[in-house]
Amino acid sequence: MSWESPVNYSVGGEDLDLDLGAFLGSLSDFDGQIEPAHSLEDEYSGQSGQGADDDPDSDGPKVLTIMASIDAIHRHLENERKKGNGKANVAIKLKDPTMRKSITFSIPELQSPTTTASSAGSPSCAPLRLPSPEAFDLGEAIFSHPTAGSSFPEEVTPAAEDDVLSSIASPFATPEGLFFPQDEDVLPSIAPLLKAANLAHATEPSLGLISPRATASESSMMPDEEAMADVVQYRDGTGTTPESLSPGDMEQDEWPHTVSSRQTRSRQAARACQTPSTMSTKDKKCIDSSSCSLKQMNSQHQKRNSIETAPSRTIKRPRVESPDLLTLIPNHDEYQRVQELTAALDPLLAYKMVRNARAILPQSVAEDMAHSADMEVDGPLHYQNNQQSPSSQEEIMQQFCETVRRIEWVERAAFKSMVEYRVLFVQLYQHYLRLQEIVVTRKGERRVTLAKEQLYRTLYPGVEKMTSSGLTSDEWEKFNRCIRRGKQWNTIASKLGVGILQRMPSSICHSWVEQKLQTKEQLHIWIEIVSLLA
């Protein structure tokens, strides 16, 4: 077949005229200089092709073979003519990756299939048997590779990519018109390559050559990108099946297909066929970015499905008690007094103050301690007053440090009662008060400040109070927290008696006293309520 009319092509944005017939004639003459190639089986098995003519580095001529399905081209043109598109055409695009230029040939008419004389007589170029369009599954796409003996023209082949296997895609491939080799056409030696290519390129449909003047009907024939992603997810076991998608989701996932987007996916499919050793850094970054965007889209899709299909769970809400003091204080006079004391407090905090105060009463303690063997109401209580008090300043500071270590051990140990914890904090604050009495101060110095400084340096030697960034150190904050807690428990013991530290049941956590009764006013109100109800 010959084309007599010249066609236009562009190089670097400039339109030039080219006699396509002369160009194809030159290809025929060029192809005639090549000896018949060996069979596919011999080339893949490596039994032939060892001569000088098959050496890719030799000075012999190189042949560019364009493999395409003529039936697919004719079927595409016939479908376009039936749709009323009388100007259906076929485009051939030659791209030079080295010079970063491309030549596009727009062929007005394609009358009948034709082959060159040399390619028709070559057994290696015999067409493969292809299944019908209805016989394949969209998720089982296989991309075949050319033989290792075939090579590209010198002027379009990069030096670093001589041994790269390039994919061959059928032109005008659509979801209803893809062509792949049958099982009997696949040689055993290349079966692993086809399986690897099938897994790597399942997301990229075979787009082939698309005319720059593609119509909207051509765009509608292209597969949906997100539908292809769902197929890959199902095959990898990481997503839902395509049947699980509702029609509304499929319509929502559709996007306007353009020529530029199809060409971009075609280039990505060709780059994905390259081996990691010969792939350029730019191509690797493109593939990584594409995979990251696909993973992000799939994760968002899975999150949306999980939110929509998540079963309803019962949320456990905290128990809210009614802050009614009448249920706790039956005596009217006591109730009026408690109302006056807690008028400025939160009602829920006032209710808990009264509830914990009633829990300390002797009858409540006797009932609560009946099941506890380690808390004896009438037993002796080891307190600082029963021990020999230190006299010197060094002894006091040493006792203070030992008490802090003891508190840390009690907090980490699995003890059954909080009695020892409370007693240790009272002893800690007693050491602190005794050191304030005997410390020697200079003019303008405060006993409280000097006592804290000496205790801190003894407890944490070499650790400054302020960090290099101007903030207080963790050790200084922990030291002040110990002093503050010791003051709270010492105040309770001094107002209500030392026995209160043992009579407090386990239902009253030490964290409630230390965290809820933060201010001095709140602590004294609770102490007065305990004294009133006792």
UniProtKB/Swiss-Prot annotation:
Pathway: Secondary metabolite biosynthesis. Residues 112-127, 258-275 have a biased composition (Low complexity). Residues 34-61, 110-130, 236-287 are annotated as: Disordered. Hypothemycin is an antifungal agent that exhibits excellent activity against Peronophythora litchii, which could be helpful for the storage of harvest litchi fruit. Hypothemycin is a strong inhibitor of a subset of MAP kinases such as human ERK2. It can therefore be used as an anti-cancer drug thanks to its inhibitory activity of Ras-mediated cellular signals. It can also inhibit Trypanosoma brucei kinase TbCLK1 which is a good candidate as a therapeutic target for African trypanosomiasis. Finally, hypothemycin also has inhibitor activity of T cell activation. Transmembrane segments: none annotated. Part of the gene cluster that mediates the biosynthesis of hypothemycin, a resorcylic acid lactone (RAL) that irreversibly inhibits a subset of protein kinases with a conserved cysteine in the ATP binding site such as human ERK2. The first step is performed by both PKSs hmp3 and hmp8 and leads to the production of 7',8'-dehydrozearalenol (DHZ). The highly reducing PKS hpm8 synthesizes the reduced hexaketide (7S,11S,2E,8E)-7,11-dihydroxy-dodeca-2,8-dienoate, which is transferred downstream to the non-reducing PKS hpm3. This is Hypothemycin biosynthesis cluster protein hpm4. It comes from Hypomyces subiculosus (Nectria subiculosa).
